From Swiss-Prot:
Cofactor: Mg(2+)
Top-tier EC class: transferase
Organism of provenance: Yersinia pestis
Localization in the cell: Cytoplasm
Cofactor binding summary note: Binds 1 Mg(2+) ion per subunit.
Gene name, Swiss-Prot/TrEMBL: aroK
Binding site for ATP: 14-19, 120, 157
The protein's name in its UniProt record: Shikimate kinase 1
Amino acid sequence: MAEKRNIFLVGPMGAGKSTIGRQLAQQLNMEFFDSDQEIERRTGADVGWVFDVEGEEGFRDREEKVINELTEKQGIVLATGGGSVKSRETRNRLSARGVVVYLETTIEKQLARTQRDKKRPLLQVDEPPREVLEALAKERNPLYEEIADVTIRTDDQSAKVVANQIINMLESN
């Protein structure tokens, strides 16, 4: 089995970070964290509310602090928020404190996976979701690529299949 080192999942919304992260943690008998869920737990409010009240900048400040604390732990799987990589500090911490896995997917898959999810503040706007996702991809994909140790496409694969691919890649490195 892969040694117990931190595994950090990055990628766009709808790539499957939380679902795959839970599966991966279960298979490796590691503790799982989701940075968005941790923010919700600490604030007692959902991410959308935090965005509405504090704005994206306030949310990103919280996210940076949460990810800093979580990445200091050992032997965890962490699903990060899609925009967490906007922070250079967060990118540096993720790179230094574990293996970064970029879960890549298409805009079409993102649209299919997020269309009924009202907990995506960046999609609760007047612009068409495709345009929002394309703009986010243009901004963030280079940042995911910059820190990724491993990149895996998640398009038509189950969480278990992707988790197994990650485990196999970790064991071969």
